[in-house]
Amino acid sequence: MKYKDYLKYWQDIASEKGYEESAILLLLLYEAKLTSSELYMKMDDEIDKKISDNFETDVKKYLDDNIPVQYIIGEACFYGYDFNVNNDVLIPRPETEELVENILFLYDDYFKGKDIDVVDIGTGS
């Protein structure tokens, strides 16, 4: 099966079950070891059996066992940085990224030219 058909097939299943289609894309990129651009260039290529087998194992963890994609692939992006994650740590939330961004915008207004200490309390592992 071609990458484009395979991806659409699994994204449709995820969507029907109320899951994010973008998560399916992330899992395919992870197992195929491709960037988004590389995958786009290979959309008409046949998917390798080993990639599809590993991908389907990951998709089942996501759709059937409700395991977050970040735990399956072992990393999460936060404020432009990739962090290793597993069951022992919390996955960074988009709302926390917004908080960091807001604080950085306010920094110059209140603390320009001053050294400050920042304490992160109760926001994760």
Task: Label each PLM-derived region with a short phrase.
Residues 56-125:
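SAM-dependent Rossmann-like transferase core, predominantly class I methyltransferases
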Residues 1-73:
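N-terminal auxiliary segments of SAM/dcSAM-dependent transferases
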